[in-house]
Amino acid sequence: MSYSELYTRYTRVWIPDPDEVWRSAELTKDYKEGDKSLQLRLEDDTILEYPVDVQNNQVPFLRNPDILVGENDLTALSHLHEPAVLHNLKVRFLESNHIYTYCGIVLVAINPYEQLPIYGQDVIYAYSGQNMGDMDPHIFAVAEEAYKQMARDEKNQSIIVSGESGAGKTVSAKYAMRYFATVGGSASDTNIEEKVLASSPIMEAIGNAKTTRNDNSSRFGKFIEIGFDKKYHIIGANMRTYLLEKSRVVFQADDERNYHIFYQLCAAASLPEFKELALTCAEDFFYTAHGGNTTIEGVNDADDFEKTRQALTLLGVRDSHQISIFKIIASILHLGSVEIQSERDGDSCSISPQDEHLSNFCSLLGIEHSQMEHWLCHRKLVTTSETYVKTMSLQQVVNARDALAKHIYAQLFSWIVEHINKALHTSHKQHSFIGVLDIYGFETFEINSFEQFCINYANEKLQQQFNSHVFKLEQEEYMKEQIPWTLIDFYDNQPCIDLIEAKLGILDLLDEECKVPKGTDQNWAQKLYERHSNSQHFQKPRMSNTAFIVNHFADKVEYLSDGFLEKNRDTVYEEQINILKASKFPLVADLFHDDKDSAPATNTAKNRSSSKINVRSSRPLIKVPNKEHKKSVGYQFRTSLNLLMETLNATTPHYVRCIKPNDEKLPFHFDPKRAVQQLRACGVLETIRISAAGYPSRWTYHDFFNRYRVLMKKRELTNTDKKNICKSVLESLIKDPDKFQFGRTKIFFRAGQVAYLEKLRADKFREATIMIQKSVRGWLQRVKYRRLRAATLSLQRFCRGYLARRLAEHLRRTRAAIVFQKQYRMLKARRAYRRVCRATVIIQSFTRAMFVRRNYRQVLMEHKATIIQKYARGWMARKRFLRERDAAIVIQCAFRRLKARQELKALKIEARSAEHLKRLNVGMENKVVQLQRKIDDQNKEFKTLSEQLSAVTSSHAVEVEKLKKELAHYQQNQEADTSLQLQEEVQSLRTELQKAHSERRVLEDAHNKENGELRKRVADLEHENALLKDEKEYLNNQILCQSKAESSQSSVEENLLMKKELEEERSRYQNLVKEYSQLEQRYENLRDEQTPGHRKNPSNQSSLESDSNYPSISTSEIGDTEDALQQVEEIGIEKAAMDMTVFLKLQKRVRELEQERKKLQAQLEKGQQDSKKGQVEQQNNGLDVDQDADIAYNSLKRQELESENKKLKNDLNELRKAVADQAMQDNSTHSSPDSYSLLLNQLKLANEELEVRKEEVLILRTQIMNADQRRLSGKNMEPNINARTSWPNSEKHVDQEDAIEAYHGVCQTNRLLEAQLQAQSLEHEEEVEHLKAQVEALKEEMDKQQQTFCQTLLLSPEAQVEFGVQQEISRLTNENLDFKELVEKLEKNERKLKKQLKIYMKKVQDLEAAQALAQSDRRHHELTRQVTVQRKEKDFQGMLEYHKEDEALLIRNLVTDLKPQMLSGTVPCLPAYILYMCIRHADYTNDDLKVHSLLSSTINGIKKVLKKHNDDFEMTSFWLSNTCRFLHCLKQYSGDEGFMTQNTAKQNEHCLKNFDLTEYRQVLSDLSIQIYQQLIKIAEGLLQPMIVSAMLENESIQGLSGVRPTGYRKRSSSMVDGENSYCLEAIVRQMNSFHTVLCDQGLDPEIILQVFKQLFYMINAVTLNNLLLRKDACSWSTGMQLRYNISQLEEWLRGKNLHQSGAVQTMEPLIQAAQLLQLKKKTHEDAEAICSLCTSLSTQQIVKILNLYTPLNEFEERVTVSFIRTIQAQLQERNDPQQLLLDSKHVFPVLFPYNPSALTMDSIHIPACLNLEFLNEV
């Protein structure tokens, strides 16, 4: 393509600039062949003539279209060159605040110098499992790519992080390791991932330091291998270090620091455990005060030191070793501060024996003070014949001291690294690893020494490996697409590497010079000049003979040779090392041990540090103290680097290049000069150049067709094959066939071709735009002319009409004036005439009226005089009549009073007489007579029988007569005594009763009197209050309106707050349940990992039963504690503690219920004991078994009736008291008379029922006593009399027994009457007390009202009104509340009484029926002994009976092996109903163990099924519905009133009778929560792969989303073949499947709503998180697609009647994000609209979307930085969370509302498919 085609008008180019490196310009005219310059317009409108040389290709770089600016991947740019890369990085960094950008396989990371919220757990989970090209560039994306390739390809991976000091290498490596620790968490409980992360603060403390470029610069290189097992869980790690900068220990440049650990230790020197270190502040030590700045802004060294100690502890470093480490570090500081004094001769030095620092140094290391003092100033020379000790000069001593300090620190550094590796080592077999290389980047300073040379040498090796890997990937891509491939020429830095490491290279010559005894840096430099002066990569500086220049891949670097030899030798005198070996501290001696020193530095298994120095003698007999180590530093580094390269070559590398944007560490400040230097040094531009040499732009045929179809002709579009269309179009558009290639699935373009196509597309649009503008302008002019012509005609028409209307108006006015004059004159004359007539009539009327009134007054006076006379005469006659009548009444009253006194006296005399008592006892005597008659009748029968049998019983006749006489005599005596006693008791009781009646009358009179006075006072007060009622009502209305508004607002706020607190509390509880289930699963996993074999359980129950070992309430508290202890023994302390927590919460309620039940239970046990005792006696005495059972049953029923009667009486007393209280309130307030009378009626009815029940109890007692007497009489019979001779005596005994029985009945009746009299007197006393209490209450109320009235009189009228209104309001409020409480209490008592009465009546009926049946059985026992009675089959009562041994079979058939498909077509939740019917039968039989065992087995069986089918949605939903239904059944039939409101009478009969299963309801509720969470997890796992593809990528609206130039070029390693692409219909189908399954399983509708609310939240979270992390998805068309997809989901919710679930509200953030993408983003009003609309999005999310927003074409403007700043300013007031992404793992707390079933238990039938034939219906 010619230059004239490329450089046309409006084309934008890049030109060099001294300040900004590159500057943008625009051509103002086309370039023509032969032109020597281009006319350009700069951005500031400056016109510039830019010279060009087409022959030498010296033309400005072309600028990419705006549509490509801001791309995620630099290789996606059409024009690939330095200015394009720099500009793209600048735009992303400054305008969008994106610090990560891809450059092919390289991740470019720019240090923002600011904490960004993009590294949280939510971001990690968002990138987990995603393809590298699908998400925005991030270090987590690179880590995920490495993890994914390791798992898929089973090949080791490596991440190489490089860059300048301060560029963020350490932070990037740290975040990569954090990602691996999160997604690859260890399966066992070793916490290896925590240890890997804990190694970072340790290595930062001992290996990082503050430099001029970075406050936390790593001064060593490290390679961390993170090991994984076959399941790709972290099992261990290993660290290798390279080239520690030891010189920093003894020297720091200005404004730099030593290693952090020194300053941290000084900051913590005040701690008690560090007093022996003798440390002070860092400024006091020579080695820490070199740089002049000992602090770092924003860094607390003391806190960092504490973190370092915690990390050492976590990694297993003992406290003693930690103290030893800190002693060694402190000794280095003291060593550097030792004062060395030079002698006069200058050749020797000395150290003062009193030097405090030297003493501290020796004491901290445990060495001899004198020896170290001597050998610091002397050295030993060994020859073949003798040994010399030589003094050293001051400089030599300082160098030796510094060398010793560096060596000590290096050894300590190696020891710490070795122990970290031991802590991270694992015994498990490592399957694969991911290595993270954090190594120094290319460095160049004003003065470059040995360290910079080694660093740049390492970067040369890494760059060579990088180039070969990039080249290989490019070649693989071309081969995959089956296009021709030619070798690309790329930079090969092997010659530079050979210059450094080849034989006789720089390092080889350096080692040779180090071996020379008197070798110098100058001699070495001269050898370099001589050997390599002809090399292209080596140069000699013009002005220096001690420096040399190496031409590296990034830049030319000049090295100063001074110090190279000394640093390469790293000499330490052996005498000093020997002193350290003799230390009394084991750690110090171990650091310098011979075995340790002799180990090779390259041994990766034992020594991972590249800075290892060997100190040993050359010969075993003659020690040479000055002999240097055999292996120099350069050799060691070269060896370790080769090993590293071997490791990296055996892995798949991933590259992260860190860029430092500025040297001032300013946040989000970009310096182009510094950035370009680093881009050139780190290989990014080399990657660009390799890509540009081939075909960097790649398009799929589909995307190319959609993007450039505007360039196609109509006839070309007739072809249906898009691939052929693209080929024909490209051949016509681009003439040079070398500029593009057709691959198998993509089209490959040379650099610049996509930009050319974009230019053609833009030209096409520009031409179309011009055509449209021309047509529109012509149309507008025509419309304008037509509008003007129509306006002119209209104006003329209106003018003519106006003139005609004005003439007509003038004529009308003239005619109207004449009419007005005529009418006015006529009106004036008529008014004058009417005035005269009206005056005449008025005068006549007044005159006539005067005469009429005068006559009327005279007649009226005569009439009134007559009336007065009539009334006076009548009054006189009435007065006389009344006086006579009063006199007659007085006489009559006196006579009647006299007669009444006489009658009273007679009544008193009669009351004292015995006749009265006899009349009272008439009824009693009648009963006695009846009993006597009965006795006489029986005697007659007895006499008749005795006469018939006299022949046989003549010998006993005399005895019988004697017994009869004695019996008669005894009866007479007893009756006489009893009658006298009863008469005396009745007389005393009547006296007391009369006395109580008289007192009651007195109190009633006093009460009536006081009540009358109070009513009068109340009437007066009400009269006064009546005056204030109107004003009160007005004020009340105002107050009510205000209070209503305030209360509504406050109630809404309180409701919201309470709902929020409830949700939080429920969420916390369910999270605890979830954690509990996780701990349970973890426990099972640990148990499974144990050595397999038979393990004996400590109890007879299985281990699974212990999981839900909850006792029922019928057991004692001791049993509960024993069960809890058994749980601790069976399942461990942790789990039992959690179970005990739930148990203790419920135990409080259990105790309260047990206190109430203990009394009844004690009575029951007593009755049972009596019954058992009676049975034993019956067996011993040979009595009938049936008769004894009846007696025991009657005794039990009697006790129950007595207890219930007492309870009923107490309830009636409470009801009476409540009624009396309400009556008192009614008397004081004169309100609610109807309710009072209603309650009295209810009380009367209750009393009547109580009396009836008392009579029934009396009858029952009599019958029971008769049975007892019969049994006692049977026991007293003579056992030795034979049957023939004893029968007559038996008859006699029966006769006597009847008499005694009748006597006891009379006594019992008398006692009953006495009890009734006592009860009545007590009732009267209680009534008197109530009346007194009422009087007192009325008095207090009167006093309060009087005080209130007095206070009111003292106030002003306005205040009185206000005070009165307030008092009235408070009074009415209190009364209303009291009435409500009373009504609720009465209603509750009424329900309770009715229920108890019903139960009482039923039990009485049962007792009567049972007794009648027993008597009938006894009567017909002999007749029916040989007859077989066939029992009629009873109705099904809704219970299922099973044997204990069938429990396992029941659980297996009904739970473990049950498939949901087996129950299709049956009642939903059938297993739950069957289980409840089994529980009900166990309750019916009062079998506590059976209930407990069945419930425990059921719960554990469900858990086992769910664990087995942990990914089966249908099975999980099946058991969720059954567990919830089982829980509802336990509530519905528990007997609690709150759960029985919707039950039918039949259902109430199915309630549990003996057990309270409240604890098990809580266990089932927790199990339901666990099942629900598992259900949500399964559903989310099925939905999540569809969400991103369906919601963001699929085109729901065809043709809406335009295609823009591709972003990241997805590598073949990043993609999985055959990736699924989902559409919205797939989500809808999956939702339909979920809904169908849930409905078929009979799950409660409320739970179904919550399930879909959770699923829609997950859809919202995943979609929004991906939207926030994908630049290609943030466009206007994506917003339209999203809104359409959401509307389809909302329509589905409405179609399924799920729109009330709150699911739509969970989608609100996504809805607002879609609207944000579609809104205008230009003006201030647009910003306000966005802020008001996007209330569910946080500030960070809004800003992130705006930064990511990308136009689809160049005609749409980008969002400006100023607009984003405006949005941020307006949203500053928001208190938004700092989290960018939504928590996709969040689960709403589930609520299981009570949902009773309408089915009755007796209507449920068991299908045969369940194989439950062993269950028996009861």
From Swiss-Prot:
Every Dilute domain range: 1496-1773
Region Actin-binding, residue ranges: 641-663
Location of region: Disordered: 1086-1120, 1161-1188
Keyword hit for Transmembrane helix: no
Cellular localisation: Cytoplasm
Coiled-coil regions listed: 1140-1261, 1313-1415
Domain of life: Eukaryota
Quaternary structure, from the entry: Component of the CART complex, at least composed of ACTN4, HGS/HRS, MYO5B and TRIM3. Interacts with RAB11FIP2. Interacts with RAB11A and RAB8A. Found in a complex with CFTR and RAB11A. Interacts with NPC1L1. Interacts with LIMA1.
UniProt-listed PANTHER family: MYOSIN (PTHR13140), UNCONVENTIONAL MYOSIN-VB (PTHR13140:SF356)
Protein name stated in the entry: Unconventional myosin-Vb
Organism field: Mus musculus (Mouse)
Gene: Myo5b
